[in-house]
């Protein structure tokens, strides 16, 4: 009998073992769809981004008008731009849900997969930040100024570091040029990291909603989960296209329709919605260095998850107290997101400070304590 090319060809064999004959737990739920959705998001963003880059000019005098030109004069340029801008939002929705799933079901116990995932998140955040600067509107310019300025809080080398990043003494043409270069490069770095992420995942195999060994009950990825993933793609593309076609500017800032002007500061500088929770934590501390450290900690704290897991059970499926705490944490993140979009005045300042304290308390103290308590209740 002739050998099956899919199983014998050196390249096809790798694809086959990752996407076709991959043994998959039979009981994984729709929460396991977000990994493939993130892959689709990345491909969509790279494709639309490439098409936009063909019409974009990374120069302070031309950037804003080149984006306007793309939307007005390029065939379907408006659609490509709207899909790219809103695609970023969906990318973050998917990654936050993906991380939330990992946290709820104890997937962070696969340390290598979890750590590469956090590095992916940080790279995605960097990509989104430099990308937001490119249209060179008011919020692009001032967002870049404010966020890059945070590095000046680093003792001794801070100011030098910022001027080195800017390529001058303020955000100007060299900054825009290098941000465009970075925005073009980083998505390919994300694609490379994704392969590492998947390699680590396939070393151990997928986790499942029960958090138990599933080796005795595995099914092939194709056709079961390929079909399930296609359903996921459809359910994501529907709201994405609806948003891009019906209200493309819903999530954007009106301030960005004004070309960048270093002499006029917008009344309220704020990042895109997906960074607001971290921005709220940054603002909640009155000291600059303290704020920067809290901002970094808000994401880097995820690295500690495997070490803060004290429960004998892996997932939260049968741990009602941890479930309650988890949903309080989710609510708290929504509160932080809302506070980040509000001006710095009473009562938002105190709400932001309380929500920031709660965020760190839940993750660092309450989760390990409740996990230990649940062990005691179950007589472990």
Swiss-Prot record:
Pfam families, sorted: Cytochrom_B_C (PF00032), Cytochrome_B (PF00033)
UniProt binding sites for a ubiquinone: 202
Disulfide topology: none
Keyword check for Metal-binding: yes
The keyword Transport appears for this protein: yes
Cofactor: heme b
Record function comment: Component of the ubiquinol-cytochrome c reductase complex (complex III or cytochrome b-c1 complex) that is part of the mitochondrial respiratory chain. The b-c1 complex mediates electron transfer from ubiquinol to cytochrome c. Contributes to the generation of a proton gradient across the mitochondrial membrane that is then used for ATP synthesis.
The protein, known as: Cytochrome b
Native source species: Daption capense (Cape petrel)
């Amino acid at each position: 009998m002739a050998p099956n090319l899919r199983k014998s060809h050196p390249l096809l064999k790798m694809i086959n073992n990752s996407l076709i004959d991959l043994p998959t737990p039979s009981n994984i739920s729709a929460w396991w769809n977000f990994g493939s959705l993130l892959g689709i998001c990345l491909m969509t963003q790279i494709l639309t981004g490439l098409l936009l880059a063909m019409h974009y000019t990374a120069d302070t005098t031309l950037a804003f008008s080149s984006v306007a030109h793309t939307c007005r004069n390029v065939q379907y340029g408006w659609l490509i731009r709207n899909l790219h801008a809103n695609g970023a939002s969906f990318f973050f929705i998917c990654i936050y849900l993906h991380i939330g799933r990992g946290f709820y079901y104890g997937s962070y116990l696969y340390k290598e997969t979890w750590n590469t995932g956090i590095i992916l998140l940080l790279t995605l955040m960097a990509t989104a930040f430099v990308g937001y600067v490119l249209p060179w509107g008011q919020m692009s310019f001032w967002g870049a100024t404010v966020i890059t300025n945070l590095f000046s809080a680093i003792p001794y080398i801070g100011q030098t570091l910022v001027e080195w990043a800017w390529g001058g003494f303020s955000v100007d043409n060299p900054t825009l040029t290098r941000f465009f270069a970075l925005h073009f490069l980083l998505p390919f770095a994300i694609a490379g990291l994704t392969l590492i992420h998947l390699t680590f995942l396939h070393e151990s195999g997928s986790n499942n909603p029960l958090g138990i060994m599933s080796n005795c009950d595995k099914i092939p990825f194709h056709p079961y989960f390929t079909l399930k993933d296609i359903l996921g793609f459809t359910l994501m593309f529907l709201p994405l296209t609806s948003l891009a076609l019906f209200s493309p500017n819903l999530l954007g800032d009106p301030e960005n329709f004004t070309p960048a002007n270093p002499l006029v500061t917008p009344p309220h500088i704020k990042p895109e919605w997906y960074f607001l929770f971290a921005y709220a934590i940054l603002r909640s501390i009155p000291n600059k260095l303290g704020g920067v450290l809290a901002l970094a900690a808000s994401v880097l704290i995820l690295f500690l998850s495997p070490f803060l897991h004290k429960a004998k059970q892996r997932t939260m499926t049968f741990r009602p107290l941890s479930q309650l705490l988890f949903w309080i944490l989710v609510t708290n993140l929504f509160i932080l997101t809302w506070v980040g979009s509000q001006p710095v005045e009473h009562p938002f300042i105190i709400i932001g400070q309380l929500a920031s304290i709660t965020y760190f308390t839940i993750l660092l103290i309450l989760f390990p304590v409740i996990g230990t308590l649940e062990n005691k209740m179950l007589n472990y």
